[in-house]
Amino acid sequence: MNVLAKTRVYELAKELDITSRELIDILASEFNITVKNHMSVLDEEDAELIKEIFDDEENSDEKANRSVVADEEIDASNKKVKNKKKEVKKGNKNADNESSEEEIVIEMEDTITVKALADKLKKPTTEVIKQLMFMGVMAAINQELDFNTAEKLAEKFNAVIMQKEDDTITKEIEDEDEGTEKRPPVVTVMGHVDHGKTSILDAIRKAKVTSTEAGGITQHIGAYTVNVNGEKITFLDTPGHEAFTTMRARGAQVTDIVILVVAADDGIMPQTIEAINHCKAAEVPMIVAINKIDKPAANLDRVKQELTEHNLIPEDWGGDVITVPVSAHTKEGLDTLLEMIILTAEMEELKADPERKAKGTVIEAKLDKGRGPVASLLVQNGTLKVGDSIIVGNTYGRIRAMFDDKGKNIKVAGPSIPVEILGLSEVPDAGDRFNVVKDEKTARNMADKRKEKLREKRMQSTNKVSLEDLYNQIQEGKVKELDVIVKADVQGSVEAVIQSLEKLSTDSVKVRVIHGAVGAISETDVTLAAASNAVIIGFNVRPSNNATVLAEKEGVNVRTYRVIYDALDDIKAAMVGMLEPEYKEVVLGSAEVRVVYKISSVGTIAGCYVLNGKITRDSSVRVIRDGIVIFESEISSLKRFKDDAKEVAKGYECGLSVEKFNDIKEGDIIEAFTMEEIKPKNL
C-alpha cells in the first residue's frame, strides 16, 4: 500500500460508522489492502474509493444481495460485515450494543496505570489484566504501562491511544510569540587561542576582567551589557566555541551574532576554522574582527584571502562578510566594531515581548557555600522578576534575589539582559532552558516529570546518528542529510576526503562536511558532532581518552580508518542503504487443491499436492482459479500430516490455510512467492 495521505484507518472507520477491526477485515477481504493496525495510513485514493462504495451500498436497494456468493461455506465469514452494514442502514437501532462497539480515543502521557486505562476503556480491571496476560505481560492493578503496550492493549478493546504533551507545560510555556519590541543583540566572541578574544572583551568593557574580579566588586556572571549610542549590546564573556556549542547541543540558541577574532599577524588557525564551522552549522551571522593591526607583521589582505578559502568573502572584496580591523591594545576600530554589531542586529530584526512571562537560557551555574545553587541566566523573552516561580531544565525554584552583571541587586530584568539568581532547588546545567510558571508547585511538578522522562530516556538506546541506523532514520524523516566531521593526520588527506565525500551527494541523500581539520579527534569535535547529529571520520588519527568517553556518553558515532577509500566505501554503503529499495517477485512453487476441509474453530483447510518447487510457511500465496488470481495473502498454517512444517517440496502432500480467506475450492492452484529486495549497486 502506498502511503500518500494522512487518512488513518481509525479515522475512516469513524466516518463509515464501523469499528476499526471490521474495516481492517473489509480492506483485506474485499479491497485486497493489508494494514497492520488502526493507526496505519491509507492512500487517499483508496480511502475515497472505499467511502464511495459504502455510500453506493447504503443508497442501493440491492445492498442485501451484494455479499451473496455461490458457496454457503463463506456465509459465516461475511455475516458480521453484512450485519454491521445493515445496522448502519437502520440507523443503529440497537443503541446499547452499538455504544459498546464504538471506538474510544484515549489520550495518555508516557505511561498509564492498568486501573486508569481500564477506567478509560470502560472495562473491568480483571478483563484488562487478563488481556495483558494473553499478551505475555504480567501486571498488577497499579502497575504502569508504557505507550506501546497500552496501544496494543487498547487495540484489542477497539480503542485508539493518542500520546499527549503535559497540559501544564503546554499552558505555561507553549507561547512562542517573539513579540514586536526591539531587543538588544546577544554576542559571542570566538576565535583561535591567543588571538585576543579576552582582550577585545576587556577593552569593550573598559576594564580588565582580572583586576575587577580580584577585588570582588564585579560579579562574574558569564555575560555583561554595554551601552553604545543609546543602544544596548549583551556580550557573553565566556569566549570560545566550546561553550557556544555545548549550549547548542542542548538545544539552546542564545547567540544572535558571532564576533570571529583573527590575529592580523597570524591569520586563520585551526581553532579559527573550528569556530567558522560552528557558526555555519548554527547559521548565526558572523562579523570578523581582524585584531592586532598595531603589530608590525599585520597583513590584512592575507587574512581576507584566507577567509575566502572558507567561503567567507569580505564586503570590500564583493562579498557579504563584515570585516573590521581592530586593536584591543590601542582601542582602534572598537567603535566601528560596535557600530557593525548594532547594524547587523538591525538587519536581523531582533524582537521580544517584555509583557509576557520570561524565558531564556542558563549561561553558567555553580553551588555557592553561602548562597546555595546560583545560576546566571540570559532572559531571551519576557520580563523576569524577583518572586517569579521558574522551571529550569530538571530543577525548579522561586527567585529570592537577582543581580545584574555589575553585582547590583535588581528587581526586574527584560529581554537580552543577563542576571544572576538565587532560589533554585538544585544546580542546573549550562544551556538549560528556563520558563516562568504560575507557582512553585507547578514548577516542582514539571521538574519531577522531566526527571522521570530523563530516567526513561537513559534506559532507552541513544538516538544519535550512526552509519548503521541512518537508513531507518531517513525512512522516518528524521535525517535528511548526512553530516560528517573529518579529522586526518595531514591537510592533504583532509581536503581529499572532503572533496570525495561531497561528490557522493545525490538528490536523495546529501553529504555535508561541517568540519575538517588536522589532528586527533578531540572533545570539541565530539561536542560539535553531538550538537549537529554528525558522524566523525578519522584517518590515521585516534580519539583522545576524554573524547572517547564523551563520544560514548553523547552517543556520537566515531569511525577511524587507515585507508581513505575504506571510509568512502562505508559512507557510500550507508547512503546506498538510504535509497528506496526495489523488489522483485520470486515464485517458489505451486500446489493444487485436491480436497477441502471445513473446521469450525479454524476455518477452511486446503489439502494440496505440490506440483513444482516448494511451499514454505513464511511465503506469500495467491489463489488462482481458472487462470485468474482471486486472492493474495499469507499462509496462516502449513502442515504435513498432523505436524507443522516449515516447507513442503514437490511431489508431497500438505494441508494449508490462507490468512483471511475461506473460499477455497477443489482444483484451485496455490502459488507461493516471496518479494526479494534488490539492493542498489550504486548511487
Curated annotation (Swiss-Prot):
Gene name tied to this protein: infB
- Identify this protein by name: Translation initiation factor IF-2
Where does it reside? Cytoplasm
Annotated region described as G3, given as residue ranges = 237-240
Residues binding GTP: 191-198, 237-241, 291-294
Domain tr-type G residues, every copy = 182-351
Q: Which UniProt keywords apply?
A: Cytoplasm, GTP-binding, Initiation factor, Nucleotide-binding, Protein biosynthesis
The cysteines joined by S-S bonds are none
**What phylogenetic lineage does the species belong to?**
Bacteria, Bacillati, Bacillota, Clostridia, Eubacteriales
Ranges where the record places region G5: 327-329
**Any one annotated GO CC term:** cytosol
PANTHER family in the cross-refs: TR-TYPE G DOMAIN-CONTAINING PROTEIN, TRANSLATION INITIATION FACTOR IF-2-RELATED
Q: Which organism is it from?
A: Clostridium novyi (strain NT)
The organism's superkingdom is given as Bacteria
Q: Where is this region: G4?
A: 291-294
Q: What is the similarity comment for this entry?
A: Belongs to the TRAFAC class translation factor GTPase superfamily. Classic translation factor GTPase family. IF-2 subfamily.
Residues annotated as region G1?
A: 191-198
